[in-house]
Design a protein with these regions (language model features):
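N-terminal accessory targeting/assembly segments
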Residues: 1-84
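Structured core elements
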Residues: 27-29, 37, 79-81, 87-91, ...
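Conserved nucleotide-binding/hydrolysis micro-motifs of P-loop NTPases
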Residues: 34, 44, 94-98, 109-111, ...
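Generic domain-boundary/flexible-linker signal
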Residues: 39, 114-116, 201, 252
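P-loop NTP-binding catalytic core
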Residues: 44-50, 61, 65-158
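Switch/coupling sub-region of P-loop NTPases
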Residues: 142, 150, 155, 161-169, ...
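Conserved glycine(s) of the Walker
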Residues: 172
Length: 253
């Protein structure tokens, strides 16, 4: 093991070692200094930890160096894998909030499921048209047909349906979206993708604000764009992603 490998392993063990050994753990997320989230059996749990901004940034730099890469303000995102197999996504300012570093670690499953296990669990039911309509869908259809649109919208947000808010400039699209946030269950993990910090969370705690320069989507070669932030989300395991603007290729991601 080289010196840089030893440094990375020491950081991993010091900051995350105890949590990585938790039974059933699938994810670790650090959104800001002093707090860490674990995901076990599909549920997020918050932990207070003595983890500073400098600690998180040093881990990010060490991870980048280990892979012959770099992470800094002009290249603020890195997707990488630890030697022990955990996949990481790290994001530093200005692509996230000032004085924060977003660190997400995904622990690979060691369980091998046989094909029959998938069959018994109904994995192919959607293909064979044997899958029953979800109760949520039936409820939403009933609300829509009854023209109870206010409750229909609230439930769409609660159940995680994809919503697009369209309107002319100054029509209140972002304000309307911010109102709907209150119907997202508070235990879920949320990421936002914004060109300006507009979204404020009052009840939710497990969230990460991601930012891109407003002109970035128009510049060829831009490192931080709505589309790149959306791709970084693939390793951040959010339950909800909020985009304040959809103006380009990110619509297809």
């Amino acid at each position: 093991m080289t010196a840089k490998n030893i440094s990375l392993d020491r950081y991993k063990q010091r900051f995350f070692g105890d949590f990585l050994e938790l039974p059933g753990l699938t994810e670790i997320a650090v959104n800001r200094p002093g707090e860490l989230y674990t995901k076990i059996n599909g549920m997020w749990e918050q932990h207070a930890v003595p983890l500073s901004y400098e600690d998180c940034y040093n881990f990010a730099r060490c991870l980048a160096k280990h892979h012959g890469d770099n992470i800094e303000d002009i290249k603020p995102g890195l997707s990488a894998t630890l030697e022990s197999g955990e996949r990481c996504q790290v994001i530093v300012p200005p692509a996230c909030e000032r004085d924060t570093v977003s660190v997400t670690i995904r622990k690979p499953s060691k369980i091998q499921i046989p094909h029959q296990g998938y069959i018994d669990a109904g994995f192919y039911n959607r293909v064979t048209n044997d899958e029953k309509t979800e109760t949520h869908d039936e409820e939403l259809i009933a609300l829509y047909n009854a023209r109870n649109i206010p409750l229909f919208m609230e439930k769409c947000v609660e159940y995680g349906k994809t919503l697009a808010v369209a309107g002319e400039t100054g029509s209140g699209k972002t304000t309307f979206m911010k109102m709907l946030i209150q119907y997202i269950p508070v235990h879920l993990r949320i990421t936002t993708i914004e060109d300006n910090p507009e979204i404020i969370f009052f009840k939710h705690r497990n969230y990460v604000h991601l930012f891109y320069p407003s002109e970035s989507s128009d510049e060829k070669g831009s490192v931080v764009t709505p589309a790149s932030l959306l791709r970084w989300n693939y390793r951040m395991n959010p339950d909800r992603i909020l985009l304040t603007e959809v103006r380009g290729a990110e619509a297809w991601d």
